[in-house]
Amino acid sequence: MALSLGQFINVGGMVKDLKSFNFSVYGRWFGYINIILCIALGIANLFHVSGVIAFGIISIIQGLVILFIEIPFLLKICPLSDNFIEFIKRFETNGWRCLFYLAMAIIQYISIAVMATSLIVVAVGLTISSISYAVAYTKHQEFQNTNIIKNPTDDDFPHEAVVREML
């Protein structure tokens, strides 16, 4: 029995999220996309021979921080300092996440002053997340978790026995 990505993604939850019209969910979806964009394009921009390398490193760090913000389950399973966990827990509301993503986007927009690179895509992605959280905040929508990634406590989540069988 092999594990597949489909076992970890909840398609029914995605449809439910789309119908909810809760912009905090959309912000979280773009947050997942931003994790991939920040890390991938950050690595890609390490090969420039200019000051863009610094912004590439910042982008990689941003991707890792967003990973812990958008997937809070990782805070419980990864050995992290208490200061870092407290820092991440500050961003549990729409308003704070809006400001966080806006600050991150501004940092990446500054990279354009050095050289126009693919980090513009990172900046735009972070801006979209910021706008989504801002709309949720102004509409007084409750911060809501998405149903895309299955919760490890769900009955149909692949457990240790499945992993042991695979090995």
Curated annotation (Swiss-Prot):
The gene is TVP18. The chain crosses the membrane at residues 23-43, 49-69, 98-114, 121-137. One of its GO terms (cellular component) is Golgi membrane. Glycans are attached at residue 22. The modification Phosphothreonine is found at residues 146, 153. SMART domains: Cg6151-P (SM01077). It is a multi-pass membrane protein. The keyword Zinc does not apply. Keywords: Glycoprotein, Golgi apparatus, Membrane, Phosphoprotein, Transmembrane, Transmembrane helix. The keyword Signal does not apply. It is found in: Golgi apparatus membrane. It comes from Saccharomyces cerevisiae (strain ATCC 204508 / S288c). Belongs to the TVP18 family. Golgi membrane protein involved in vesicular trafficking. It comes from the Eukaryota. Interacts with TVP15 and YIP4. GO terms for biological process: vesicle-mediated transport. InterPro entries: TVP18/Ca-channel_flower. This is Golgi apparatus membrane protein TVP18. Disulfide bonds: none annotated.
